[in-house]
Amino acid sequence: MGKLLIVDDDLSILRVLKMRLESEGYQVEVASEIEAAKYLAAINEYELAILDLKLPDGNGIDLMKSIHEVDPGLPVIILTAYGTIESAVEAMKAGAYIYLKKPFDYRELLFQVKNGIEMANLRWPSRN
């Protein structure tokens, strides 16, 4: 399976997602701050990123834009508890693969992780 980056300021969400996705065979790295996430994205190759929309030091959309400067083909799932139609549209226009509201169904998230990686591999075969 692939390597994932998860960024969320809620440490319980980070722990649960890391544990569940690792049990599915993924390698998972986590960050709770934007600068740490940017650093990880600069030194690692990920197959997908899961980013919280609202972070204490910024937002997931701006983080996604920064990550896409390093890896334009990286699929990004945006998660949020504070979602609006406007923020969903903004995220998708900025390059998000999908936008999910918290609380989310883990099965849906897992499906979107698998699907996002497959779609990215089809669009950018050099990512394989």
Describe the predicted segments one by one.
Residues 11-29, 43:
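Two-component/phosphorelay signaling modules centered on CheY-like receiver
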Residues 39, 61-73, 90:
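Short amphipathic alpha-helix used as the core "switch/output" element in two-component signaling
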